[in-house]
């Protein structure tokens, strides 16, 4: 179950991925390299972290979160497999009506 780090911070939460606790941060565009929408640390990092640009919305945000979660769970998997799988899962969830709810 994902949990917000603090009730006051809607841009951070923790969750288990691949059996490890991960920090998920929704960051400003300037906090992440301009050539990416999100990134994923390594599971062996002291505080494994996924960063997602706040500016990404809708189905693209869903795809991005799934993409980075797949990297966290399967760090040795190819980018091609992660891209394809994340997009297919996001398309399925979107078609089933899943949408982001403001907390």
Question: Positions of the model-derived regions?
Answer:
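Active-site scaffold of zinc-dependent metalloenzymes
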Residues: 4-59, 72-93
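Short, positively charged interaction helices/loops
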Residues: 96-103
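Active-site recognition of the HExxH zinc-binding catalytic motif
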Residues: 63-72
């Amino acid at each position: 179950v994902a949990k917000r780090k603090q009730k006051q911070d809607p841009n951070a939460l923790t969750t288990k991925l691949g059996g490890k606790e991960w920090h998920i941060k929704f960051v400003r565009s300037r906090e992440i390299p301009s050539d990416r929408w999100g990134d994923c640390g390594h599971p062996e990092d002291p505080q494994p972290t996924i960063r997602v640009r706040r500016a990404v919305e809708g189905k693209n945000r869903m795809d991005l979160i799934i993409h980075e979660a797949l990297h966290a769970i399967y760090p040795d998997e190819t980018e091609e497999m992660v891209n394809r799988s994340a997009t297919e899962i996001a398309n399925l969830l979107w078609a089933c009506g899943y949408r982001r709810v403001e907390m």
